Curated annotation (Swiss-Prot):
InterPro entries: 3-IsopropMal_deHydase_ssu, Aconitase/3IPM_dehydase_swvl, AconitaseA/IPMdHydase_ssu_swvl, IPMI_Swivel, LeuD. One of its GO terms (biological process) is L-leucine biosynthetic process. Catalyzes the isomerization between 2-isopropylmalate and 3-isopropylmalate, via the formation of 2-isopropylmaleate. It comes from Shewanella denitrificans (strain OS217 / ATCC BAA-1090 / DSM 15013). Its EC number is 4.2.1.33. This is 3-isopropylmalate dehydratase small subunit. Pfam families: Aconitase_C. Heterodimer of LeuC and LeuD.
């Protein structure tokens, strides 16, 4: 998993609340169990006018040329609600997004995002709205996110602090998923296993 320390990138706003996992990646695209190839289906029902995904919806922000290459997504509260599917952060990451900023996230999505190297940042409603206004008002507006300093910097230079539990921050800074984090305790695990009584082994 790619480590995350700081990132500056083009930001795009989807000014909607309660964006659920079925909107992020519809259920008909969940048959794969590998993480790649989901980006093309991200927000499928909003991005395309047809079921085959051959007719882009020109009104949807991710299809607009000014947001091509966006790596930071801004959204409203309760992002990632709905059914638990790890494919949702897979699709966001495969599309090229590194950060999602919103006033709140569904708990399961929040954990899945961190476990897959996608940084979910919680800011206040007013701060998210300011970011959206700046991004929508300036062509090519970039937002910076510093995980070491726990700061978001808006296109105008406004700084917004955010918090993240230290265990999640450690995982992202070091590029560790759940398996990778477990492997960092390899010596302790081996020492424990070496002391297990034979009758329990």
């Amino acid at each position: 998993m790619q480590a995350f320390t700081a990132h500056s990138g083009l930001a795009v706003a989807i000014d909607s609340a309660n964006i659920d996992t079925d909107q992020i990646i519809p259920k008909q695209f969940l048959s794969k169990v590998t993480r790649d190839g989901f980006g093309v289906h991200l927000f499928h029902d909003w991005r395309y006018l047809d079921d085959a995904g051959e007719k882009p919806n020109p009104e949807f922000v991710l299809n607009q040329s000014r947001y091509k290459g966006a790596s930071i997504l801004l959204a409203q509260e309760n992002f990632g609600c709905g059914s638990s599917r790890e494919h949702a952060p897979w699709a966001l990451a495969d599309f090229g997004l590194r950060v999602v900023i919103a006033p709140s996230f569904a708990d399961i999505f929040y954990g899945n995002a961190i476990n897959n190297g996608l940084l979910p940042v919680v800011l206040t409603q007013a701060q998210v709205q300011q970011l959206m206004d700046e991004v929508q008002g300036e062509l090519g507006a970039q937002v910076s996110v510093d995980l070491q300093l726990l700061r978001v910097i808006s296109p105008s230079g406004a700084e917004f602090p955010f918090s993240l539990v230290e265990s999640a921050r450690h995982k992202l800074l070091n590029g560790l998923d759940a398996v990778g984090e477990t492997l960092t305790h390899g010596q302790a695990i081996s020492a424990y296993e070496a002391n297990i009584p034979a009758w329990l082994a």
